[in-house]
Amino acid sequence: MAKEDVARRRSIRAYARPVRQPLVWALDVEPEEGRVWIDGEALWAADVVWDLPARGTVYGLLLNTESQRAAFQPKMTAPPYGAPPAHPVLYVKPPNTLLPTGGTVALDPDVAAVAVGVTVGAVFRRPVSRVDAQTAEDGLLGYVAVADLFVPHDDFFRPPFRTRARDGFTVLGPWIVDRAAFFPDVLRYRIWIDGRKATEGEERWVRPPADAIAAVAAFMTLGPGDVLLLGTPQAAPLAQPDQAVALEVDGLGRVEFAVARRGEGR
C-alpha cells in the first residue's frame, strides 16, 4: 500500500473552510503530520489558505487550568473575595479578534509584546442550554486549536477587554476535529517563536470540558458556531513585532501567525 494511502487511513474527520469555499467542508486530516485531503488530493495544511472554521461568539474561561489557578490562588482568597470563585469566570473575544491561521496580528503602538496563550476551543453545532455533564458534549461539532493572545497583565479582577479584545487576538486553527476523534482531558502543547521552542508542557483542567460546558450553559445558551476556550496555561511566552509564532496542540494540529506593528495613524 502506498505511503499516502497509509497516512489517509490514519486520518480523522474534521471540518474546515478553505478560502474560496463558501461552506464548512468535512475533511480527512492527519493533525500530527499536518496533512489534509481536499477533493481526494493530499495537501500539506501549510500550503492551503484557510478561512475561519467557526464564526460564532468566542468565550474564554479564566482560572480553568491548574497552573493558572495555582498562580492566582493567593489573590482569590484575599479580600474582598475570601474564596476561589464558585462559578466559571468568563471573558469574551468579540468578532474583531478572530483571525485564521496564517494571518498577521498587528500590535497597537501601546503594546510592546503580546502573550501567546495556547488552548482548546469547544465548537458548538447546535444550541446548548441547561445540560448536565453527561450530555454537555452532545451539542458539540468538535474541537479546535487556538492561540488566545493577550496584553501581559497581572489583574484578572477587572473587565479584560483592553488586554484580550484587540484585533486579531484569537487565532483559530485550520480545522475543527470531530468530537468523536479527540479527547480533551489533557492539554499537551508546544509553542515556537521564530522557529525556536519557547515552551511546551502538559496542562490539566480545573473543570474538565463536559463540566465546564455544563457550568456555563447553566446560565446562558451556547449557540451554533460559538466557541468556548477551555483555559490557557499560566506560562505564556511573549512575541514581538517582526516575529513568527507557531503552536501545536496534540490531536488538533498547528496554528501559525506573524506579529507586526500597526502603523502610526492607522
Regions found by a protein language model. Name each.
Residues 30-53, 68, 152-266:
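Catalytic-pocket segment enriched in acidic/His residues
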Residues 70-72, 102-104, 110, 130-138, ...:
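A short secondary-structure junction signal
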Residues 1-88, 180, 196, 244-248, ...:
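N-terminal non-catalytic cap/leader segment that marks the start of a structured domain
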Residues 81-136:
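Hydrophobic alpha-helical segments and helix pairs
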Residues 119-123, 144, 190:
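Residues embedded in well-ordered beta-strands
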Residues 65-67, 98, 130, 235-236:
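Glycine-rich nucleotide phosphate-binding loop and flanking beta-alpha elements
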Residues 74-80, 133-144:
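Short Gly/aromatic-enriched secondary-structure transition segments
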